[in-house]
Amino acid sequence: MSYLNPEILARIMPLGLRAQRVVEGSISGLHRSPLHGVSVEFANYREYAPGDDLKRLDWRAYARSNKFHIKLYEEESDLRATLLLDASASMRYGRGAMTKFQYAATLTASLAAMLIRQRDAVGLAVFDEAEQSWLRPVATQAQLAKIIDILEKAQPDRKTDLSAVMGKIASQIKRRGMVVIISDLLTDLDGFYDGLSRLQHDGHEIVIFQILDPDEIELPFQDSVLFRDIEGGASAEQLFAEPWAFRKAYKAAMETFIGEVDTRCRLAGIDHLLLRTSDDLGLAMSHYLHSRQRGA
């Protein structure tokens, strides 16, 4: 399936995603930078766009391609965002139009397109119990094509170890920026909170999109159901049960789980947004981006 949805992009592109904390970068003034007078290093090219400084046109690149290109430097991105996408087996679940992974991948692609449109650098890490793919943040159109290619090839399959992945990602991100985590968060929460603390200690702004299927929240089944640990492999535990017998207790436990994550994030100054796969993604994202603008 295509993860770039024109209707979603039309809703969110005019809004944009702005950093609410001080980040490293200083070009267009959308984000404040704590760094002034730092040295810059050539990183890449992008095609010329109206309003760009003509002094920065690369004439050699024009001679090679017959297209106008602007030189990009490492310090030129207003925001460096790294998107962490959960591709563990639990993300395969879904009885509606999309699985959790398909919904999350659509969100990832939409965020990447929006960030690159506003000339910010975006990177991607796809993970399960380890890091499957890694792209360092770059602010070019070619980066979006790479991200889409990785999303289309990703296969949610193994267990989750979000805390270990967050530790590795923290060591790979060299400069302060934004880290966006897109996951169902069905993982060890203590390790997850430790990972959040490390990222915050390193100066990153964190945004969490928690993706759940409505079934996981409501447990709507009426008939007898065989429940199976989707990340347990061939030896997964199974339970044949009548959902009505424990629906109330299950929903209370799930409400406590979601509430705890939301409270911990709020106290730490971290944005946490719960998204159900039945939610209109474009509408939910536009509401969130509007709320960030009001709170910025």
Regions found by a protein language model. Give the residues of each.
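An amphipathic, basic-hydrophobic helix/alpha-beta surface used to engage anionic
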Residues: 1-138, 178, 182, 188, ...
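Conserved phosphate-coordination/catalytic loops
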Residues: 102, 156-163, 186-187, 252-255
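Helical mechanochemical/support elements of P-loop NTPase systems and associated helical scaffolds
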Residues: 55, 77, 143, 158, ...
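Von Willebrand factor
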Residues: 143-177, 189-190, 212-213, 217
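A short, mixed-charge helix-start or loop-turn motif at secondary-structure junctions
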Residues: 90-94, 151, 243
